[in-house]
Amino acid sequence: MSDSLDNEEKPPAPPLRMNSNNRDSSALNHSSKPLPMAPEEKNKKARLRSIFPGGGDKTNKKKEKERPEISLPSDFEHTIHVGFDAVTGEFTPDLYGSQMCPGKLPEGIPEQWARLLQTSNITKLEQKKNPQAVLDVLKFYDSKETVNNQKYMSFTSGDKSAHGYIAAHQSNTKTASEPPLAPPVSEEEDEEEEEEEDDNEPPPVIAPRPEHTKSIYTRSVVESIASPAAPNKEDIPPSAENANSTTLYRNTDRQRKKSKMTDEEILEKLRSIVSVGDPKKKYTRFEKIGQGASGTVYTALDIATGQEVAIKQMNLQQQPKKELIINEILVMRENKNPNIVNYLDSYLVGDELWVVMEYLAGGSLTDVVTETCMDEGQIAAVCRECLQALDFLHSNQVIHRDIKSDNILLGMDGSVKLTDFGFCAQITPEQSKRSTMVGTPYWMAPEVVTRKAYGPKVDIWSLGIMAIEMVEGEPPYLNENPLRALYLIATNGTPELQNPERLSAVFRDFLNRCLEMDVDRRGSAKELLQHPFLKLAKPLSSLTPLIIAAKEAIKNSSR
């Protein structure tokens, strides 16, 4: 009798999404992002010789002295003129544009772009309706900048809660202004560094969401696209912003304005940032929770305080842009907040950089979004915490640029924290807009997709898309080919909900404020913190049953 009473007093289990038990266990290898191909040993040695000309044997030194120095061509441009024939619905050579450049023949759309377009599922009608948007997304997809900004590091084993820690600290941060002590790395210089990367290896395509996070209604992409590695660096000049014609510039072998930092200079700079001492004497009970391409993530206990932390151990020799790690550490060190997974400490241990971060055992919000159903009060609570983090970052001139459920970590107490500053940008009042294309496509703001100058409100758009994730289990257009998804983001405006009638009027208004196409009318983090929807927020402890239910569902599906 008492047992039956106890059972009646227990609250009902949180509702699970229909897809939680229909997953292929093989999908639980969370390698959602493709890893770059390992460069050939010969290429590695050649690159090292180019960076450290003093190295090598005496014979090579003698040959180097005998060889005359010939400078690289500078400011070389390959201009491509693309027009659009409204009658045939085809992209054609732009005869007018070619006349503007004497001696150049009209070329039309590059062959690799034509191949991308054929497999993109963008219909002829859509191409005819907005050819400029098509060119914008083709330029993005073909851009090496996008390839170099992919988060290559994804863990292959261990606790899924490691996800946010493994993705963080990638050497792909771009900063518009440098924090103290950091070497100046301008946007243009960073792009030139990317051009020097080995072009022989094919770039990875934009990875769709892992199969286990898709709903039962999600169609797989019909055909994967192999993105050609074309060094496409210059933004479309204002004079060429025309719906029927655009001039695109391909720069090759541009002369470097400033040389890269040497390994010794990078180590010297890191020594001025990191703590002195042996971290093995400060932390104990190391437990591996994840493995990535350039490092390993462990949990450990701080001996003095008993605090559980996450420690990422990165082999510096395997980091493609070691100098940018400095910028990221400084940005994170200077921006601490209760709603951010905070940087705690760092150490140099031999050839490794150890970065110590807060540890949240609840895992990423993606687990909760894909495995359970959240109500509006719980969604409001998550949105409030994220907006508090964004308000703090934006007030400190930092744009996150990759807001999505994967980058929100949860504590078992329901705490909500923003992580992964691999794409973050620091801006100044003098340079309050940026125009680089970074982030994850399905969460991107339209102004980012179309390569316009943008500000902190790109994070607000992404937050709105993440709110849709919390309602529907996935972002809009996830079932589309990535290239077509970019086109739809650029042209459709605010995405439509599957069942808007199920949402309250105040929630729909909140989404509309986040997903406003007109950036000036889109709410800021500070403004949205006053939105009536956030008054519906439940206590953060209401997220704990969802976190437990998500972990249980993942555990059961892996059996």
Curated annotation (Swiss-Prot):
Reactions the enzyme catalyzes: L-seryl-[protein] + ATP = O-phospho-L-seryl-[protein] + ADP + H(+); L-threonyl-[protein] + ATP = O-phospho-L-threonyl-[protein] + ADP + H(+)
EC number: 2.7.11.1
Active site: D402
Keyword Transferase carried by entry: yes
Natural source organism: Mus musculus
Gene that encodes the chain: Pak3
Enzyme kind, highest EC tier: transferase
Outcome of substituting K312R: When expressed in hippocampal neurons, decreases the number of dendritic spines. Strong decrease in the number of dendritic spines
Name of the protein described by the UniProt record: Serine/threonine-protein kinase PAK 3
Annotated phenotype, changing H81L: When expressed in hippocampal neurons, strongly decreases the number of dendritic spines
Matching SUPFAM superfamilies: Protein kinase-like (PK-like)
Modification(s) after translation: Autophosphorylated when activated by CDC42/p21. Neddylated.
Pfam family name, one: PBD
